[in-house]
Amino acid sequence: GAVMAFPGSAAMMENIWAMLEKDAPAEFSRDSFYTTALTAMIVKEEGEAIDSPRIKHECGAMAMASLHYAYDQWRNFGYQPPNAVASVWEDYTKLLSAFPEERRHQRIHLGHNCWVIPEEQQFLTKELLQATCLIGTQEELIEKLRALNEAGLNQVMNLPSFDPRFDVL
């Protein structure tokens, strides 16, 4: 099986399957390969903005962890950052470049999956939150989860920010 980043749609889950099946042994079967997506899942109140203070507080740490990961992938392997971070990428890389290279790896993951440090709050955009977290009304979440399940996602592991975790879970 696999624990993976949250696939934002059923189509994305199908792309994940295509990658897994490409070089898989002949006996590989979706039915026997368990998939789990790691994300923060938040039930949005009617009319609430995706980037509301409450949503940022409850799932911002997960969104920022994905930005940390994108930076590491870019820095270590030259991978293109995802479109969801395009609007903040230049400012984010500038912020991190201010830290000495020999200590930067420690700074990159500060607060990782627990909280968002104050100077990184500015990078919690609507686009980043939508791309990395499962946010919606109860009906929207049910619809999205059903579509992902039909595409072969078996489980969602909900990892909210540390401080509000008991309220969220």
Q: What does each model-found stretch correspond to?
A:
Residues 3-4, 157:
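Conserved beta-strand positions in the central sheet of alpha/beta enzyme cores
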Residues 4, 8, 133:
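Conserved aromatic-histidine-acidic binding/catalytic patches
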Residues 7-8, 38-43, 161-163:
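Active-site beta-loop-alpha junctions enriched in small/polar residues
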Residues 146, 158-169:
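C-terminal/domain-terminus segments
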Residues 151-153:
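Structural motif
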